[in-house]
């Protein structure tokens, strides 16, 4: 996609950066639509379904919402537009559709079908492909993986402020949480409670932003947990709980690969306990920083408040009792817990407001999804 845009000379650097980011997330809807199947089969099983869901997700929960039509149309071809008697909705979307086609034939070692390409895409795209391949050798780069380094170098042109970083983290967190509607508000709740607790602890604004990012990423490892376990309508078996526990280590490993060590530790070690009985590493005492303690307590509170198919959320009195018992057993920080209890109503009210806003957008998105499927099916 990047090389095709370069040789077309139709796009500014800023546009290319944003469209490339969108392209990376082009199948984000498949994560929801085909969550119980192999995601690689999404293009075959439900191409329009996951394109529509992905587009609405980007529109509602992404800092790149202006580019949502690129995702919406990334399976549209000239033949599709002709059959549906529609004008081209998004030129970058059609180019992404062509890029997706190239990727599929390269992965499967197929030969390009020139007649098929001419039927489905503007003839200009073949010229762009040949020129880009000649200049940048992207066919071989796709095969041997060198394209990753090229993309990373290109993205060095991208400036992202703290607010945008938080927005991207929210997008990633929502993509994971929306797999299961039982857990859809959990991450927002953890972020909101963490922010309020950090303020009460007189943490600097810069560190509060860091804590919010970590709270948003705290369950990133659940991307590897089977949906059947995440949505199980009852208590997990010992074996299932061991699988669920693995999300901490998976998240730790993911963020380690990104060289985000402080974010990694605050985000993914929220199941560690002060007495060393937690997981995945059995840290204890001073090995668990203030920021880690804040996210850990926020995660516990969110879990206690949250309703699931098999349980109602606990009452204020029950939650306070459980937290105090954990303090006595040296599981969680005494001072942070006391701050929460003393400010319970305010903190929970702020968290509930954050959740209500997100859930309203999510509900509207689901309704629009059904409407758009009728239009584009």
What are these regions (language model features)?
Residues 1-377:
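Histidine- and acidic-residue-rich, metal-dependent catalytic cores
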């Amino acid at each position: 996609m990047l090389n095709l845009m370069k040789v077309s000379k139709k796009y500014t650097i800023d546009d290319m950066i944003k469209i490339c980011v969108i392209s990376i997330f082009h199948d984000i809807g498949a994560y929801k639509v085909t969550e119980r199947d192999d995601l690689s089969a999404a293009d075959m099983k439900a191409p329009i379904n996951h394109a529509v869901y992905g587009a609405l997700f980007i529109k509602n929960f992404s800092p790149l919402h202006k580019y949502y039509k690129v995702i919406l149309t990334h399976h549209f071809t000239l033949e599709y537009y002709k059959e549906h008697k529609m004008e081209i909705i998004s030129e970058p979307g059609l180019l992404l559709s062509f890029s997706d086609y190239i990727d599929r034939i390269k992965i499967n070692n197929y030969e390009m079908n020139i007649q098929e390409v001419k039927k489905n895409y503007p003839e200009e795209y073949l010229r762009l492909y040949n020129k880009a391949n000649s200049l940048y050798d992207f066919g071989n780069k796709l095969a041997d993986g060198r394209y990753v380094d090229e993309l990373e170098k290109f993205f060095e042109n991208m400036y992202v402020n703290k607010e945008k970083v938080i927005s991207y983290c929210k997008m990633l967190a929502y993509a994971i949480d929306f797999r299961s509607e039982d857990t859809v508000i959990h991450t927002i709740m953890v972020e909101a409670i963490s922010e309020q607790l950090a303020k009460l602890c007189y943490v600097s604004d810069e560190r509060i932003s860091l804590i919010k990012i970590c709270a948003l990423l705290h369950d990133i490892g659940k991307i590897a947990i089977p949906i059947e376990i995440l949505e199980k309508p009852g208590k997990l078996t010992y074996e299932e709980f061991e699988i669920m526990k693995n999300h901490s280590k998976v998240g730790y490993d993911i963020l380690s690969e990104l060289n985000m060590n402080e974010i990694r530790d605050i985000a993914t070690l929220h199941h560690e306990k002060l007495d060393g009985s937690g997981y995945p590493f059995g840290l204890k005492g001073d090995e668990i920083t203030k920021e880690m303690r804040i996210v850990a307590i926020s995660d516990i509170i969110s879990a206690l408040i949250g309703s699931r198919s098999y349980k109602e959320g606990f009452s204020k009195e029950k939650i306070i009792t459980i937290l105090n018992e954990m303090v006595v057993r040296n599981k969680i920080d005494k001072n942070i817990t006391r701050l929460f209890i003393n400010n319970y109503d305010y903190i929970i009210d702020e968290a509930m407001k954050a959740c209500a806003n997100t859930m309203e957008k999510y509900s509207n998105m689901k309704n629009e999804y059904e409407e758009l499927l009728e239009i584009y099916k």
